[in-house]
Every structure is written in structure tokens, then in C-alpha cells.
């Protein structure tokens, strides 16, 4: 199986829009190819999502006081045949379902406390890390449970070979802002998801005076940089929460505090994306689709 996640947003004039659904469609094709499933044309994927948002328009909420309520869409494809054994699917089911959702942070944005996972890996090079499939998320659950028992909100995974290179959280991409104005994020090397929110942030970064940099990030470099103030702001990003500030890292028994846990630049990036999605700012890149 493979799946996607995107949202339908109601604007002030009552119109309903999707944010970069073509990017989700392209990633859906990539995921299908990796798992030997039939590929659905991007246009058909987008039309299905637009059609559901139109049919279920009464379920697309007003933004509300938080300014973040929306209809979450879940397109998915599963093997659908009577067969017992190992083999690629000859019959599949593609469907899109939706559910109204509120703000990810009901009582305001709160910084995350991350458990640094140096042993268990979420994915490995040559595996399915770039595909959006359930197995990747299932592989993160044991570490998520461990994180909760340690009082953490989420897990920061490193690579499966050297156990040192930062990859991503259980369901979000990772980014850090350096004091000299670089927006640093792990490079795409086949083990992390090609996040649409990640891509969008990298594209708007220059508008905020930031230099986007995709490269390998050593976990010890990050933690040392957080301690010294070299990385004063750190955050995670994804469709559900958009941008989530990170306040601290728990590495073994050592806690490392972020200098600016809800930093000005992090929150400005978050506001920029939300304003585009909800029509409060001009969409000069043509990201919205109705």
C-alpha cells in the first residue's frame, strides 16, 4: 500500500483550495514505482482530490479562531485481489477519504522535546524511505513508545549505517537555522521523504533572507551547534503541523536546550505558509489549486 496526505482550505470568500496537489501526485507515482504498484497519472490524482473536496465541501470548515481548520485528505492505493503469496499486485484499489481537522496545536504552538534515536533505524539506503508507505511509519513506532516513556514528544532518527547522520522525525522533516542565516536540512539521499512542506519552505527561504542548504548533518554537529548558539532555531515540518518548533533534544541522559525554542524566523516561516494556504497572502507561485 501507499498513501498521501494533503489538505483542502476554505478561504474568506468561501472558495476551497488545495495546496500543491500536483506535488503529492508526483510523489504518489514515485511511491507506486518503488512498491511495484500501478502508477496513477498525476492529473487523475489531482482531479480525484479536487472532486472529493467539491463533493464534501460542507465538511471543509471555516479557518476558525486558530486560523488553521481544514479538511484533511487521504488518497491511498492498496493491493486488492484474492491471492495468497508474494508477488506484485495485478489489481489495486485507489480511493480518497477526508476528515475535518483543527489546529495541530489546539492551545497554541508548543516546542517539541525530541528523543535522539541512535540505535533503531526508520529506513535504510536502498529501502523504501522515499516512498510514502505504512511500513516506514510502523518502523518508527517502537522508538516513539520509548520517546513517550522518556517524556519526549517525538523521535529524531539518524542513518542506519553509521548512526550519525540526521534523517527525519517519525513523520516530519527536520530543519535548522544557523546564526549566519543558513536554513540547513538533510539532503535527499533515498532514505527520507520528499516532503512537500519541506520543499515549499526551501523555496520561500530566500524571501526571508535565508540561504537554503541541503547537506548531510552530523547529529553531534547539530547538538554542539545548539549548545553554542550556532543553531539558535530548530524545527520540524510536515502537512499536519506545517512548522513545529523544537525546544530540546534528549540524547541518552543528556538534555540539550535550544536557544530560541519558538524563534522569530521559525514562526515567520510558519505564518508565511499558512497565509498562502488560507488565502491571506498572495499565491505568486501558483501553488493553490481549486
Predicted regions and their residues:
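Glycine- and Gly-Pro-enriched alpha-helical subdomains that act as flexible
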Residues: 162-190
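Feature captures the catalytic cores and cofactor-binding loops of soluble hydro-lyases/lyases
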Residues: 195-200
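Conserved alpha/beta cores of soluble small-molecule-handling proteins
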Residues: 1-154, 161-165, 203-290
